[in-house]
Amino acid sequence: MDAELAEVRALQAEIAALRRACEDPPAPWEEKSRVQKSFQAIHQFNLEGWKSSKDLKNQLGHLESELSFLSTLTGINIRNHSKQTEDLTSTEMTEKSIRKVLQRHRLSGNCHMVTFQLEFQILEIQNKERLSSAVTDLNIIMEPTECSELSEFVSRAEERKDLFMFFRSLHFFVEWFEYRKRTFKHLKEKYPDAVYLSEGPSSCSMGIRSASRPGFELVIVWRIQIDEDGKVFPKLDLLTKVPQRALELDKNRAIETAPLSFRTLVGLLGIEAALESLIKSLCAEENN
């Protein structure tokens, strides 16, 4: 029974984290209350109605099914989870019906191709009226990955001790990373003579060259950024490499204004259509 109870509670913790990863980022003034409610949801687990091992197994099966669904939805899989609990309640606290507990968690998992290990502490203080919980320490270890853009975000999540932001933002980051990779690969296959990926489809840049315009080159830099609140969004920039003679002949400053025009094009057509339009415009003569 004890082993099954422990497994049920571990599954509940995983489900609570995955549910948070599905939610949109809350407004700053909502964050504190929503975090507290999420921690409370993990522990408000009613065992009074369970009278046999069969009841536990039924509940365990239900939680495993829910965890599988949420893992499929978010792409986040928790492989291992362990917890140690230390009772910090003093005699004075006991007399006031206050309980203070420190939980030390370790878990490992992955979000698609990104593998992570987490070590974090949760301090719980409970009295007759309410239960408050807070992450007091967070250490994130990321396995070597193609996603170099994650390093700054991981440091910020550790500094803020924001476990929920880590899961939520990681989910959306990986979605954008996979979309960028698929888009670069698709354009390379469709326009093999014009598109080059010097660091492969997983990199953040794509080059466009034209055989009919030697020395003229466009480079798309597509970064995936995570802001201070954990919101994930793409940022695309256009860099131009042109011969000096072409710059001198560009009386309408089309080359100079190309980066701004490209951002406008992305806003109007969307990312993939804007990139393809750029390729076609540069390589119009080859296509004809």
From Swiss-Prot:
The keyword Transferase does not apply. GO terms for biological process: CENP-A containing chromatin assembly; chromosome segregation. It comes from the Eukaryota. Its main location: nucleus. Residues 1-71 form a coiled coil. One of its GO terms (cellular component) is nucleolus. The modification Phosphoserine is found at residue 38. PANTHER family: CENTROMERE PROTEIN P (PTHR28577:SF1). Component of the CENPA-CAD (nucleosome distal) complex, a complex recruited to centromeres which is involved in assembly of kinetochore proteins, mitotic progression and chromosome segregation. May be involved in incorporation of newly synthesized CENPA into centromeres via its interaction with the CENPA-NAC complex. This is Centromere protein P. It comes from Homo sapiens. The lineage of its organism: Eukaryota, Metazoa, Chordata, Craniata, Vertebrata. The gene is CENPP.
